[in-house]
């Protein structure tokens, strides 16, 4: 029997007996085909990078069904008789790019590009769903949701959403952001071609329709029974041989994303139950709806929306469907089944939303039990029963039509609190309530809660009985909520238990309040009425971007180089490079003890796992080499742990196997023997490090300078805040492409390393030092990186070095693609720190002195931590502190060495500054905006704090920008509106904040080479790496401008003749480090120098020519006369100040839901000084993307470690970066067209990192909203309102953090106040 399917219309036929049933579609696509657009990023269905379109033909309906799936979870055998369309299948460079690819490119919606193919397919699927009569009826609402499950770490999502919305039938073209199709204010949409579903490269192939027939697969490991009877026979046979035959029932296999151990289990039998008609049907009768267990959640949603019965009952099904749309992402709902979701809840205690809402709706479950036969159970009975046996099967789920008595009304609502409003996040708690109300009395009700840290969803029967027969009053409400305290109790070990428990009273209050006879008419209003909560506003934006024609094409919004290639998936990343013959694959064994003696390593049961070839450790370092994994100018770090581990996550060994899957599986089977006897306890905090004098030396020239006399400043102060403490945690880089490398041996003891790195030069040095061979034997090649943000600097070196060491030892190519969990654990994150400060200030709010003690956790090794102190102080100096002193200690702990991440140290510095300003404002009872403004720098104070970096007075734009953003954002008007909103809304509070930034950057020596080929085309090499920041694009523009100075015919078309090529450490030496936001400037300066040399060489030819000469003719003559048309140069900023300052301001307004703690960013207005932008489209993308990454740091991303330093939030399930639904709803950016600055590269300034700090405006606005909530709570509790304003809002300000500060008992406090107030009337 064969497995037959198509990929992009190409037929594939595999003998079923030769296919491992556990093989995923992604593995087949990436390792067995040439289609590389499908990317592995998380491997658990949480990111969308691997999304493909799956098409099935229904022979009965003669119809093709198209839907997206996550290929990392979809089993290959599940796609029998299906066509898979990848982004290459939509369009490509050979056959023509699809309009989606062009649109994403034209809207500047692709930066690193790793996520873009998945985005393309997700959008295409949404357009197909909305396709009517060959044109799209997609709405802007549907367009925004099209990519709501796809993650992007670069763009900030705004341009992606605009690209999606550009296909919508109801879009206002003036609402679309900067793009290459039409100008702002243009009303002609003819340049935006309508979507045509037929215009794609690949459609469902006719040959597959003939393949679809019933087959007998019972003799194979993969079985696809066609009836319940056939399935029953298979189950009985498996049960009879259960001691020797393991078995797995397969529907969508999406559970593997959450229960990752399933990947390692090799079952004897996989039984596909999706081809059984009875299990796929949805049947409606007079009693309700019966849904087959393998019906996908997406189909359930569609069916429930179509039910037409009495309005009350119809509303129940509509709300069930709406809630289900928040379960996982669309591409998971398309393949995940309703039965599978409930089985996970029953068997594995999965925190299911489905179980909770169906429990409230009174659902039944029909099962086929191997021991009891056919049974019909209430969902409650099903959940409470002992876990289903492997051979038991859920047949269907029944949802009844509720019939209420005459004159009674049905009320049904569902609720969930989760980090992401649109879904793709497990709930902290979910709930669903059904009530029948006659007149004003509750006849009966069903109250269900789940996902709060309990075995399964439950009904609160005690409260149901209490409410039955009662009219809802404040007193009844209070008593019902009081009863909840003994019911919704999370089990030990549940995260945020108090927060989860506090959500239950809020949800019940919301629901029961709608049933009250006379809803409260108090002022302020309660904010929850009979109307359902309004949906989140759609994303809107504006961009005010100056176009500079002075240095054309520099200054133009040129589309990013290779953006369409990235969208189609043809852009090649390291893991896309075809594996050489005999290639092996590696995976890291890392330490799980912070400080322990390593006794040895073996595998479980002392059996060598399948496919393992070798285990590489420090013992395999060759003679003459060193155990070095990272070597930079200021030090080195070891590749493997020696006799002792120094931190959790430290590399101990490198397992090499015949496949990546076997290597990863072997790591999970590895057992490291540790011993801690006679060892000192590990150092796990900065306090312990200081106590034990475990500190790294800070190089004197990197230690920041203090300003003024703080003792004098403190003496001049009217007020002082002494020894106040701030703690800051970490943040994971979360590039979409994890660490990856490929090492291939070459002749004469040489080796070629393909590395996804920001530092090819340092990778080269590290590999050479480890192998004990000269650096000219090591060639490091990097074409592009799927996101770096600093995480691909130091942390990329040991990955490449391990591959090179294994390749040299085994004399075979070795590659690795580090899985997401390992990457998160071994990469580390931002530097955690503890800050203690004392500050003196006048009664006006003017600050006179600031003293700080800063303890920075560098981890177990130095890395790039030496730069953190100066960066931190640099951003903190954005205010005039009068005098500034500090004692900074770089602490050496037994925690993982920290990575540097976008704005390293700077983002912490800006938070510290804002926390101090907020504290001063609270202590003086003054508006915080007043305190900020009064302490902004003059140019004189700026020069005192920043020395040469301050520049000339005309370069200091911050004070004018502060006023300008106040006007453009209507700040003062909105402050009044926010105040009025807070006075009239009890359960929602708003805050608004204006924040400045100053960001100092350094220029580095940067190499470049420009070569003109005989046909007039141009090749450019630079030391910098394209990470998505538009480096190649700006370099192309600069090359075109600089060579265009010749002003011969054809130079205006030079841009299309230029190609920037990959970085090669042997070809382009002194490449240094791509980071610090100035690589683009430095590279542009370097190629400009090269071009100036070429222009000088070509000028004599032009002068000797008779009349006008074209570019191609000029180059032909140059070749004929042996003119050197290749020029190299090294840009060095030695003749100018090596540093300059970047300025920006932002106003953000937020709204906080006091019941859940959810913060919605209503609007952000950014004004950023880019000088004269080299490419405003690229810089705009950098500003928005950086800001949203900062939003993650300040508001969303919880980096949680256990007491020994092991990362617990190690997956997309637990670590939540921003998504489409968490960015500002109104996102406005203006780029200030700064003046001319001769000492900078064409007067440009950096844009990559500084805007990240502006996200502090969201955090500060949230604090203002929380402050208003705390005032209200103090009033209810009869406490002094001023006590509620003195608090610190931690980072990140997640929902649990915000809710706790607003009051976990806010509902109870309100009701107690209300009852007490009424009793005094």
Swiss-Prot record:
Q: Which InterPro entries match?
A: 2Fe-2S-bd, 2Fe-2S-bd_dom_sf, 2Fe-2S_ferredoxin-like_sf, 2Fe-2S_ferredoxin-type, 2Fe2S_fd_BS, Ald_Oxase/Xan_DH_a/b, Ald_Oxase/Xan_DH_a/b_sf, Ald_Oxase/xanthine_DH-like
SMART domains xrefs? Ald_Xan_dh_C, CO_deh_flav_C
Q: Please give the Pfam families that the UniProt record associates with this protein.
A: Ald_Xan_dh_C, CO_deh_flav_C, FAD_binding_5, Fer2, Fer2_2, MoCoBD_1, MoCoBD_2
**Residues holding [2Fe-2S] cluster:** 42, 47, 50
Which cofactors is this protein said to need? [2Fe-2S] cluster; FAD; Mo-molybdopterin
Q: How does activity depend on temperature?
A: Optimum temperature is 50 degrees Celsius.
Alphabetically sorted, this entry's keywords are: 2Fe-2S, Abscisic acid biosynthesis, Auxin biosynthesis, Cytoplasm, FAD, Flavoprotein, Iron, Iron-sulfur, Metal-binding, Molybdenum, NAD, Oxidoreductase
According to its UniProt record, which reaction does this protein catalyse?
A: indole-3-acetaldehyde + O2 + H2O = (indol-3-yl)acetate + H2O2 + H(+)
* A GO cellular-component term linked to this record: cytoplasm
* Cell location: Cytoplasm
Q: What is its main location?
A: cytoplasm
Question: What's a single GO BP term from this record?
Answer: abscisic acid biosynthetic process
Q: What is the activity's pH dependence per the UniProt entry? A: Optimum pH is 8.
Q: Where is the FAD-binding PCMH-type domain?
A: 215-404
Recorded GO molecular functions are: 2 iron, 2 sulfur cluster binding; aldehyde oxidase activity; FAD binding; indole-3-acetaldehyde oxidase activity; iron ion binding
General function of this protein: In higher plant aldehyde oxidases (AO) appear to be homo- and heterodimeric assemblies of AO subunits with probably different physiological functions. In vitro, AO-gamma uses heptaldehyde, benzaldehyde, naphthaldehyde and cinnamaldehyde as substrates; AO-beta uses indole-3-acetaldehyde (IAAld), indole-3-aldehyde (IAld) and naphtaldehyde; the AAO2-AAO3 dimer uses abscisic aldehyde.
| Name of the protein in question | Indole-3-acetaldehyde oxidase
Q: Which organism is it from?
A: Arabidopsis thaliana
């Amino acid at each position: 029997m064969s497995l037959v399917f198509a990929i992009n219309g190409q037929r594939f036929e595999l003998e079923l007996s030769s296919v491992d049933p556990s093989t995923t579609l992604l593995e087949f696509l990436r390792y067995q085909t040439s289609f590389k657009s499908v990317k592995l990023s998380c491997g658990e269905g949480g990111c969308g990078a691997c999304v493909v379109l799956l098409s099935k033909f229904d022979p009965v309906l003669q119809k093709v069904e198209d839907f997206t799936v996550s290929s990392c979870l979809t089993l290959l055998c599940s796609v029998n008789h299906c066509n898979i369309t990848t982004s290459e299948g939509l369009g490509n460079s050979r056959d023509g790019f699809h309009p989606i690819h062009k649109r994403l490119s034209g809207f500047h919606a692709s930066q690193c590009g790793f996520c873009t193919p998945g985005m393309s397919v997700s959008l295409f699927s949404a357009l197909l769903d909305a396709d009517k009569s060959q044109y799209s009826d997609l709405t802007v609402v549907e367009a925004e949701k099209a990519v709501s499950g796809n993650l992007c770490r670069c763009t900030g999502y705004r341009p992606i959403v605009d690209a999606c919305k550009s296909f919508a039938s109801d879009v206002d073209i003036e609402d679309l952001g900067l793009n290459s199709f039409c100008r702002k204010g243009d009303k002609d949409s003819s340049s935006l071609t309508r979507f045509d579903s037929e215009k794609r490269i690949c459609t469902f192939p006719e040959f597959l329709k003939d393949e679809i027939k019933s087959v007998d697969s019972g003799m194979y490991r993969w079985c696809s029974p066609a009836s319940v009877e056939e399935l029953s026979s298979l189950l009985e046979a498996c049960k009879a041989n259960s001691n020797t035959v393991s078995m797995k029932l397969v529907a969508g296999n999406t559970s593997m994303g959450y229960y990752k151990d399933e990947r390692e289990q090799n079952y004897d039998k996989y039984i596909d139950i999706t081809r059984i008609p009875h299990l796929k049907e949805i049947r409606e009768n007079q009693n309700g709806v019966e849904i087959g267990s393998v019906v996908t959640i997406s189909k359930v949603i569609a069916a429930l929306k179509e039910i037409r019965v009495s309005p009350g009952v119809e509303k129940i099904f509509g709300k069930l469907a709406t809630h289900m749309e928040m379960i996982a992402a669309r591409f998971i709902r398309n393949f995940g089944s309703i039965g599978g979701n409930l089985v996970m809840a029953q068997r594995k205690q999965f925190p299911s939303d489905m179980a909770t809402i169906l429990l409230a709706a009174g659902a039944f479950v029909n099962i086929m039990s191997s021991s009891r036969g056919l049974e019909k159970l209430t969902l409650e009975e099903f959940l409470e029963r002992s876990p289903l046996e492997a051979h038991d099967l859920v047949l269907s789920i029944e949802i009844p039509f509720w019939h209420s008595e005459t004159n009674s009304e049905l009320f049904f609502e569902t609720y969930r609190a989760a980090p992401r409003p649109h879904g793709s996040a497990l709930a902290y708690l979910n709930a669903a309530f059904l009530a029948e109300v006659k007149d004003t009395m509750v006849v009966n009700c069903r109250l269900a809660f789940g996902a709060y840290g309990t075995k399964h969803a439950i009904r609160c029967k005690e409260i149901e009985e209490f409410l039955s027969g009662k009219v809802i009053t404040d007193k009844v409400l209070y008593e019902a909520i009081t009863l909840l305290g003994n019911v919704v109790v999370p089990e030990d070990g549940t995260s945020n238990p108090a927060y989860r428990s506090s959500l239950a009273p809020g949800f019940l209050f919301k629901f029961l309040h709608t049933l009250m006879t006379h809803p409260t008419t108090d002022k302020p209003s309660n904010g929850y009425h009979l109307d359902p909560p309004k949906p989140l506003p759609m994303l809107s934006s504006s961009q005010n971007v100056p176009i500079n024609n002075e240095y054309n094409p520099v200054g133009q919004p040129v589309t990013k180089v290779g953006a369409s290639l990235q969208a189609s998936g043809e852009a090649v990343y390291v893991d896309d490079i075809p594996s050489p013959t005999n290639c092996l694959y590696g995976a890291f064994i890392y330490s799980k003890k912070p400080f322990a003696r390593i006794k040895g390593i073996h595998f479980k049961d002392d059996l060598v796992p399948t496919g393992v070839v070798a285990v590489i450790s420090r013992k395999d370092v060759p003679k003459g080499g060193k155990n070095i994994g990272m070597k930079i100018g200021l030090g080195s770090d070891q590749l493997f742990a020696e006799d002792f581990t120094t931190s959790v996550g430290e590399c101990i060994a490198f397992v090499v196997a015949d496949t990546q899957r076997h290597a990863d599986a072997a790591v999970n089977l590895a057992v490291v023997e540790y011993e801690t006897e006679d060892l000192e306890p590990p150092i796990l905090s900065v306090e312990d490090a200081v106590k034990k004098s475990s500190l790294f030396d800070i190089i004197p020239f990197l230690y920041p300078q203090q300003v003024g006399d703080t003792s004098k400043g403190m003496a001049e102060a009217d007020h002082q805040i002494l020894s106040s403490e701030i703690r800051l945690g970490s943040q994971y880089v979360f590039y979409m492409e994890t660490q990856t490398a490929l090492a291939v041996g070459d002749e004469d003891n040489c080796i070629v390393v393909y590395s996804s790195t920001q530092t090819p030069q340092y990778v080269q040095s590290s590999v050479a030092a480890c192998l004990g061979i000269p650096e000219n034997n090591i060639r490091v090649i990097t074409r592009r990186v799927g996101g770096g943000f600093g995480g691909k600097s130091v942390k990329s070196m040991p990955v490449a070095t391990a591959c090179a060491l294994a390749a040299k030892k085994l004399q075979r190519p070795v590659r690795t693609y580090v899985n997401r969990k390992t990457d998160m654990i071994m990469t580390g994150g931002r530097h955690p720190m503890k800050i203690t400060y004392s500050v003196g200030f006048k009664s006006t709010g003017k600050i006179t002195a600031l003293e700080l003690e800063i303890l920075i956790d560098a981890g177990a090794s130095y890395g790039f931590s030496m730069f953190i102190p100066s960066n931190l102080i640099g951003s903190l100096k954005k205010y005039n502190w009068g005098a500034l002193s500090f004692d900074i200690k770089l602490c050496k702990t037994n925690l993982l060495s920290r990575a540097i991440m976008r704005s390293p140290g700077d983002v912490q510095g800006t938070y510290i500054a804002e926390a101090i300003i907020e504290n001063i404002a609270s202590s003086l009872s003054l508006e915080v905006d007043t305190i900020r403004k009064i302490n902004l720098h003059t140019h004189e104070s700026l020069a005192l704090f920043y020395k040469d970096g301050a520049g000339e007075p005309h370069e200091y734009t911050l004070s004018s920008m502060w006023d300008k953003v106040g006007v453009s954002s209507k700040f003062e008007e909105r402050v009044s509106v926010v105040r009025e909103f807070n006075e009239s809304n009890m359960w929602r509070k708003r805050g608004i904040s204006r924040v400045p930034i100053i960001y100092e950057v350094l220029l580095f020596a940067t190499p470049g080479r420009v070569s003109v080929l005989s046909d007039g085309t141009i090749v450019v090499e630079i030391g910098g790496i394209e990470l998505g920041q538009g480096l190649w694009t700006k370099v192309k523009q600069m090359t075109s401008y600089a060579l265009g100075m010749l002003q011969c015919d054809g130079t205006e078309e030079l841009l299309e003749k230029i190609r920037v090529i990959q970085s090669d450490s042997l070809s382009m030496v002194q490449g240094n480090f791509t980071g610090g936001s100035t690589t683009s400037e430095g590279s542009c300066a370097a190629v400009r120098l090269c071009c100036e040399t070429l222009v000088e060489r070509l000028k004599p030819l032009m002068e000797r020519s008779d009349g006008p000469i074209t570019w191609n003719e000029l180059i032909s003559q140059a070749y004929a006369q042996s003119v050197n048309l290749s020029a190299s140069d090294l840009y060095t900023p030695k003749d100018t100040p090596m540093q300059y300052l970047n300025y920006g301001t932002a106003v953000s307004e937020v709204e906080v839901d006091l019941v859940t703690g959810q913060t919605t960013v209503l609007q952000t207005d950014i004004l950023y000084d880019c000088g004269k932008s080299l490419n405003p489209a690229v810089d705009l993308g950098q500003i928005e993307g950086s800001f949203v990454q900062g939003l993650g740091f300040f508001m969303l991303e919880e980096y949680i470690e256990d007491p020994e330093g092991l990362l617990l939030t190690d997956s997309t399930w637990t670590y939540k970066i921003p998504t489409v639904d968490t960015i500002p709803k109104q996102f406005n950016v203006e780029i200030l067209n700064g003046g001319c600055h001769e000492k900078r590269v064409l007067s440009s300034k950096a844009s990559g990192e500084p805007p990240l700090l502006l996200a502090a405006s969201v955090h500060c606005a949230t604090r203002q909203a929380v402050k208003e909530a705390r005032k209200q709570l103090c009033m209810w509790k009869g406490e002094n309102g001023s006590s509620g304003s003195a608090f610190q809002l931690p980072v990140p300000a997640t929902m649990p953090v915000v809710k706790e500060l607003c009051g976990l008992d806010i509902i109870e406090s309100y009701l107690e106040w209300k009852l007490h107030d009424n009793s005094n009337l």
